[in-house]
Regions:
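N-terminal module of bacterial RNA polymerase sigma factors
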Residues: 1-32, 39, 188
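C-terminal edge and immediately downstream basic/flexible tail or linker adjoining helix-turn-helix-like DNA-binding
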Residues: 2-4, 12-13, 94-97, 155-156, ...
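Internal acidic/polar
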Residues: 3-6, 93-118
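Sigma70-family region 2
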Residues: 15, 55-70, 89-91
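Amphipathic, Lys/Arg- and hydrophobic-enriched alpha-helical face
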Residues: 26-44, 61, 129
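Structural recognition of an alpha-helix C-terminal capping motif at a helix-to-coil junction
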Residues: 35, 49-56, 69-81
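Arg/Lys-rich amphipathic alpha helix in sigma70-family domain 2
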Residues: 80-97
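Helix-turn-helix DNA-binding module
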Residues: 130, 134, 138, 146-163
Length: 188
């Protein structure tokens, strides 16, 4: 799901505490937020707990919080901070070498490009993304799958925009290198 498709109007939640809109927001963002939290805390169960804590806190403090301009960015930043606090409270340091135990399937509407890419190629692409170093993979997913700008990803991860740019270059080179034999075979 791209940033524009996620940027639904959640103002009635922030203004009125609309439970239905809150549930819609949770449903729309939870899979991506769990995936992101898992990249920080290192396992699915803790990631689920972190995301639940964020949504509980948002619900409890809805009347006191100013509605954010960018709900997606706000939620990712809240998950990042909650995950880091979770690690600190549990006597663990953040590790970017943690294995991601969860795969979140992003439901994309089919378009002509999706139809042309067969299942085997999608498996190769997913394997290439998963083989990236953890920080590089995290940046790639935020930018390419979640639709964050380089600047937003840099701010969210407390990195420079140049670092995000370098990591994206590395990610794309590694993915293309991994896919090279597959693409040559498929289209020759």
């Amino acid at each position: 799901m791209t940033m524009s498709s996620k940027a639904a109007d959640y103002s009635s939640f922030w203004a009125l505490g609309d439970l239905a809109v809150f549930k819609q927001m949770m449903k729309a963002f939870s899979p991506s937020l769990r995936y992101f939290a898992c990249s920080i805390v290192g396992n699915e169960a803790e990631a689920e707990e972190v995301v639940a804590d964020v949504f509980i806190k948002i619900w409890q403090q809805r009347a006191q919080v100013t509605p954010p301009d960018n709900v997606q960015y706000y939620l990712f930043k809240a998950v990042k901070n909650t995950a880091l606090n979770y690690l600190k409270q549990n006597g663990r340091r953040q590790t970017h070498l943690a294995a991601w135990e969860v795969e979140v399937s992003h439901h994309h509407a089919q378009n002509p490009e999706d139809i042309l890419i067969n299942k085997e190629q999608l498996d190769h692409i997913q394997a290439a993304i998963q083989s990236l170093p953890p920080r590089c993979r995290q940046i790639f997913i935020l930018v390419k799958e979640e639709g964050f700008s380089y600047e937003q990803a840099a701010t969210l991860l407390d990195l420079s925009k140049a670092t995000v740019n370098v990591q994206m270059t590395i990610a794309l080179k590694k993915i293309w290198a991994a896919l090279g034999p597959t693409l040559k075979y498929s289209y020759s």
